[in-house]
Structures are given as C-alpha cells and as structure tokens.
C-alpha cells in the first residue's frame, strides 16, 4: 500500500515503487521507514538465486554517509555484525555505497573474516569503481550460486559464486 514514504510511480510507461527515507535513517533500528525488506519462502530449496531491480538516485543526492540496498539472503539472514555460526545456518549478500558513491557488495557467510561481512568493490575490467549516477536509472542484478553441502556434514564444497552486474555489465565475480 502507498504511504507518504512509498508511492507507486510511473516513468516511461513502467511502474515502480518510489521510496523516500527519512533524514538520519541507517537501518530498521533507527525508526519507522528506515528499511525495506521483501520476505518470502521459496517453494523448494534453490541452488541458484537472482535478484534484479532498477534504481534511480535523485539528482543532488548526498552519498557522504553511505547507504545500503536490497540483496539476497537465506536461513538466518545474518547481518548487523552477527557473524554466521560455523554450522552454515544462514547468509546474506547485499549492496551498499560508500561516502564517495562507489558501489560495493557485502556478504555475511560462514568463512567471512570480520564480524561485519566481507566487502568487494564493484569495478570494471580496468578497476574503475562503479558508481550510481544521480538522475539516471540503473539496473542492479545479483546472482548467488550456493555451495552444496557434503552429506552428513555442514561443510560446503566451495563451488559457489557471487556475481553482480550494473546496467547489464558484469562488475563482480567471486568464487569459492
């Protein structure tokens, strides 16, 4: 449903959802309307998952405090400095921008190094950082290929992958 914070909009005959975040928002613990989540259960376990959406940052947007965008998650959907347990009961892969507007992927998973997930810059083949251009529509796509688990254990087989595209161009490929 529509609220003052969210509206269904039409742009070039395409419908979308416009979200406006209150000043000072950095996540759900900062108050009403400070996060967007779409939750659902898959009808069956999945080996590969995709998410793709279009985003337009308004002109004059101030990137200086950084920010986060939706991604994919499974199981306990770890985040917020909660490092996943070694039993492989959850993960999350989301997108963020830094103070300079550069785009990064961050992921919570069993083998992450720090408490706040591992981070990888989105960049082209020349290592030029990817950035959202205010006033322009961008298409963000993420693909997750999950590791399979060895029977009778919680150990992954390390054949998973995290891939990302910006406007149809691959800008991140991580495998394990």
Predicted features by range, described:
Residues 1-176:
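Low-complexity, Ser/Thr/Pro/Gly-rich disordered linker/stalk regions
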